[in-house]
């Protein structure tokens, strides 16, 4: 007996970014099977969910972490971060959260989420910060109490990335 699983866009996106991060790290032994399975999942989604998924994929970038980056303080991501990011990104709503910087100082942020950057093993929220009038990269394991803000929407901005960072759509399969 075969059953059909109902997956949300966030669940499919989580699968895709997991595969992408493993591919970027260079250790995905069954990449072909993973891609085939994900393609089947995408085909089973309703057209509005495929549109949401593609918009999500357009914001996903991967690269390699510089060897000198200290990851000794890396922690777990807040479980409510991805759902809050999904809603904020798809609906172009501000994302509000507490952010702990490298020195341990916690600040409240209200940003416009533009992209997600995976530099395995670290993940970053790339956002326009209206208070600073510039892009900011937030390590996702340092974000707590995330919530999208109902109301005013924002416009997408072109996010400049350095060489060595690629859109997930441009990664070799």
Segments the model singles out, each with a brief description of its role:
Residues 114-115:
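Short, surface-exposed charged micro-motifs
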Residues 9-81:
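Bulky hydrophobic/aromatic content
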Residues 111:
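Acidic, two-metal ion nucleic-acid-processing modules in DNA metabolism proteins
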């Amino acid at each position: 007996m075969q059953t059909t699983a109902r997956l949300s866009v966030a669940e499919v996106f989580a699968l895709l970014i997991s595969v992408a991060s493993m591919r970027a790290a260079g250790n995905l032994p069954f990449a072909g099977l993973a891609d085939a399975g994900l393609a089947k999942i995408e085909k089973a989604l309703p057209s509005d969910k495929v549109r949401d998924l593609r918009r999500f994929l357009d914001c996903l970038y991967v690269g390699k972490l510089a060897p000198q980056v200290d990851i000794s303080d890396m922690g777990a991501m807040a479980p409510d971060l991805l759902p809050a990011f999904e809603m904020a990104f798809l609906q172009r709503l501000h994302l509000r959260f507490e952010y702990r910087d490298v020195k341990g100082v916690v600040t409240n942020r209200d940003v416009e989420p533009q992209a997600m950057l995976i530099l395995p093993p670290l993940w970053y929220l790339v956002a326009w910060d209206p208070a600073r009038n510039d892009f900011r990269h937030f390590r996702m394991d340092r974000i707590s109490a995330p919530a999208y803000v109902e109301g005013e929407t924002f416009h997408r901005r072109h996010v400049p990335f350095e060489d060595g960072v690629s859109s997930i759509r441009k990664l070799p399969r």
